[in-house]
Regions:
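Active-site-proximal gating segments in proteases and membrane effectors
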Residues: 106-130, 232-236, 242, 247-303
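Active-site scaffold of zinc-dependent metalloenzymes
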Residues: 122-146
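Catalytic Zn2+-binding segment of zinc metalloproteases
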Residues: 157-176, 252-253
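Conserved catalytic/dimerization core of cyclic nucleotide/dinucleotide signaling enzymes
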Residues: 148-149, 168
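Active-site recognition of the HExxH zinc-binding catalytic motif
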Residues: 136, 151-159, 163-164, 243-244
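Hydrophobic or amphipathic, alpha-helical segments that drive membrane association/targeting
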Residues: 1-123, 177-238, 265-269, 298-303
């Protein structure tokens, strides 16, 4: 009985931390469900049936997202492959194993089967997906030093420990299904509008009304998606700082700082517009560098 209580307490704490850390993804999922529910109910005379259908779709999407299939789908979309060549294995795997070992020492509950993958994208990037996937772009491998790559890997493992990577998988799957539902609804609305117009004596008025309804629906969806992007971006920016903190905790703060300096030096994007800033998933790189420098300077003073 005590073991059961301990398990439930531990599980409750983990769920609570996940909910608190990923409130934006949960809110975004709720909004997806609401809009998809309204869209399906518009095509059904039975509201209860529409709600059941929407709930069933979301159960399937979440089931796919949290399964290995969800990670496989996203890896396939990014054309990610395991580290295969002898040169890449000899270079990258020792770096990853060093960082991974430190992460496991800090967080024993971290998945023991995380695998490193490579995408042939030329931009400098690294990201975590689900529970078992860390990806490096070819651009990062070619442009960053071994120590800088360690910093990037440590940062991504930080995302995994907080559940960010799993929440992102669920969000991507939800977005995909939502977009599909919206597309189907728009096509059906358009077809019904044309049919109704052809059979109506006031076909011109019917066409105009159908066009207005279609336009309002499209703009409402666009506004909803933009609002959702802002909510997710706001949450993501705060999560980036926490992943930086994790890299620092496991001993790779200096390496990550140098990684960010390198990324900042190669950033040719210029100033962000207001729209770009609202939808940006990462804070300004210089702000992250300054934050890490403060931590490292305090550490030097203490020791």
């Amino acid at each position: 009985m005590e073991k059961v209580k301990h398990f439930l307490k531990h599980a409750g704490i983990k769920i609570g931390l996940f909910l608190r850390a990923n409130w934006a993804y949960i809110l975004w999922g709720g909004l997806h469900y609401l809009i998809a529910n309204l869209a399906l109910n518009a095509l059904s005379r039975d509201t209860a049936t529409g709600m059941q259908n929407t709930f069933f779709i979301y159960l399937i999407s979440i089931g796919i997202a949290v399964s290995p299939l969800g990670e496989f789908i996203l890896r396939s979309l990014d054309r990610a492959r395991p580290v295969e060549t002898r040169q890449d294995k000899d270079y990258l795997l020792p770096l990853f194993e060093e960082v991974y070992e430190q992460a496991l020492n800090q967080t024993p509950s971290l998945n023991k089967n995380i695998t490193l993958y490579i995408t042939e994208d030329k931009i400098i990037n690294a990201y975590a997906v689900g529970r078992q996937t860390v990806m490096l772009t070819r651009g990062a491998i070619d442009s960053l030093s071994p120590e800088e790559l360690k910093g990037a890997m440590a940062h991504e493992l930080g995302h995994m420990t907080s559940g960010d990577s799993m929440a992102r998988v669920i969000t991507v799957v939800g977005n995909g299904l939502f977009s599909l539902i919206v597309l189907v609804c728009k096509i059906i609305m358009l077809i019904f509008g044309v049919i109704a117009a052809l059979w109506s004596k006031k076909y011109i008025l019917s066409i105009v009304i159908g066009f207005i309804v279609h336009l309002l629906f499209s703009y409402s969806v666009t506004a909803f998606l933009f609002l959702g992007d802002i909510i997710i971006a706001l949450n993501n920016r705060s999560r980036e700082y926490l992943a930086d903190d994790y890299a620092y905790k496991i001993g790779f703060g200096e390496q990550l700082k140098n990684t960010l300096y390198q990324i900042n030096a190669l950033d040719m994007g210029g100033r962000r517009s207001l729209k770009d800033w609202l939808k940006a998933s990462h804070p300004y790189t210089t702000a992250r560098i300054a934050r890490l420098e403060q931590k490292l300077e305090r550490e030097q003073v203490l020791y």
